[in-house]
């Protein structure tokens, strides 16, 4: 009898199942800041690449298994008992701590670019698991769309782990390819808007149809019924070198990626990181320029954003030129692209000089 009383004692101290889930979600959320800023674990042992990836993959499999177990348990009645819930929560927490622990084993000297990809994958898994626990807490005992979406997110994040590049060169190529695609999309959007010669054409046509049907004054509605919604001839003239600069950005990234693919060396991690770091600034700079060409156009803003992009492009080309991926620095493609960037920028300066002087 005495032993039975002792074994039953913990039951009274355990929180209800859903309350335990709420606490678990909070605990998982608290782990995220540490992963974002945490440093690699210092060790005197030589890094074992194969062992790391094996452990990282195994840790991801464990997380996905625990996500499945937890989802099944809390998607039907009766809900698990407090004791069962405690066990589920402990297993989920342990699985998440384990994969974070493996991430901390990845040293910086293997490449900052690759380490960022490993960190991003780890953050996705932790964040998605926290969202799953929250969804199960909010929608228990049912297969709600939110629960299924959250579960699939954890599963997808774990399935992504084996697809992470295994060395810094592969990681650099992965990031550069993404940057090329982003700049390509931005350039195509700019070209499409210019071809239509009216960036807000679709929106204004819809408004005009509604207004004519209802006999409503556009000015009363505050519709953009003025030149601020269109490009002036001066705007269109300024946009031409801006488009050329965006096109040069795409060409720069493609050539840099090709140079890394053909000449990049896996052991030159620092130089690869430098190339990726500066190349990462190109896409956001193109986006800023693209946004500034929409009416009402402010020539000074266009000039500033163009100068920022031109500076980033030239710096990226110079860093690439000085690195091992360009065995012949005198290679004509680098000075050719630098000249193209300078030509675009000089034309933009000419067209905006009056704004600077006024």
Swiss-Prot record:
Signal peptide: none
Interaction with TCF3, as annotated region: 1-183, 149-358
Cellular component, GO, one term: nucleus
Post-translational modification as stated in the protein's UniProt record: Phosphorylated.
Name of one Pfam family that matches: GCIP_N
Keywords: Cell cycle, Cytoplasm, Nucleus, Phosphoprotein
Region annotated Interaction with RPLP0, chain positions: 1-189, 238-358
Classification via Gene3D superfamilies: I/LWEQ domain, Talin, central domain
Matching InterPro entries: GCIP-like, GCIP-like_N, GCIP_C
Phosphoprotein keyword on record: yes
Keyword presence, Lyase: no
Main location group: cytoplasm
Region annotation (Required for interaction with CCND1) ranges: 1-207
Cellular localization per UniProt: Cytoplasm; Nucleus
Family as reported in the entry's similarity comment: Belongs to the CCNDBP1 family.
Protein task: May negatively regulate cell cycle progression. May act at least in part via inhibition of the cyclin-D1/CDK4 complex, thereby preventing phosphorylation of RB1 and blocking E2F-dependent transcription.
Quaternary structure (record): Interacts with CCND1 and GRAP2. May also interact with COPS5, RPLP0, SIRT6, SYF2 and TCF3.
Listed name of the protein: Cyclin-D1-binding protein 1
Organism: Bos taurus (Bovine)
The organism's taxonomic lineage, starting at the top: Eukaryota, Metazoa, Chordata, Craniata, Vertebrata
């Amino acid at each position: 009898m005495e032993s039975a009383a002792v074994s039953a004692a913990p039951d009274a101290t355990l929180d209800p199942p859903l309350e335990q889930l709420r606490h678990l979600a909070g605990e998982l959320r608290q782990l995220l800041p540490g992963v974002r800023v945490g440093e690699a674990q210092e060790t005197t042992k030589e890094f074992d690449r194969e062992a790391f990836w094996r452990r990282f993959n195994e840790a991801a499999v464990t997380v996905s298994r625990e996500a499945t177990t937890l989802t099944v348990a809390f998607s039907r009645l009766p809900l698990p008992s407090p004791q069962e819930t405690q066990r589920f929560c402990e297993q989920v927490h342990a699985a998440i701590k384990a994969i974070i622990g493996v991430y901390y084993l990845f040293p910086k000297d293997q490449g900052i670019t690759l380490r960022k990809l490993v960190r991003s994958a780890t953050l996705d898994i932790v964040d998605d698991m926290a969202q799953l626990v929250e969804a199960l807490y909010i929608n228990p005992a049912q297969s709600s769309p939110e629960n299924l979406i959250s579960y699939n997110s954890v599963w997808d994040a774990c399935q992504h782990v084996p697809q992470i590049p295994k060395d810094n060169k592969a990681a650099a190529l992965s990031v550069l390819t993404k940057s090329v695609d982003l700049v390509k999309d931005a350039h195509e959007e700019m070209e499409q808007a210019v071809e239509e010669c009216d960036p807000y054409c679709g929106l204004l046509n819809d408004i005009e149809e509604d207004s004519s049907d209802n006999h409503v004054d556009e000015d009363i509605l505050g519709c953009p019924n003025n030149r601020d919604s269109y490009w002036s001839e001066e705007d269109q003239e300024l946009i031409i070198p801006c488009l050329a600069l965006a096109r040069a950005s795409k060409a720069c990234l493609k050539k840099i990626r090709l140079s890394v693919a053909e000449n990049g060396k896996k052991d030159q991690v620092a130089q690869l990181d430098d190339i990726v770091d500066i190349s990462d600034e190109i896409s956001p700079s193109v986006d800023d320029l693209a946004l500034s060409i929409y009416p009402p156009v402010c020539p000074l803003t266009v000039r500033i954003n163009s100068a920022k992009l031109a500076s980033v492009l030239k710096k990226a080309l110079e860093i690439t030129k000085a690195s091992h991926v360009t065995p012949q620095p005198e290679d004509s493609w680098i000075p050719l692209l630098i000249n193209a960037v300078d030509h675009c920028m000089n034309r933009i300066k000419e067209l905006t000089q009056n704004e600077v002087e006024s």
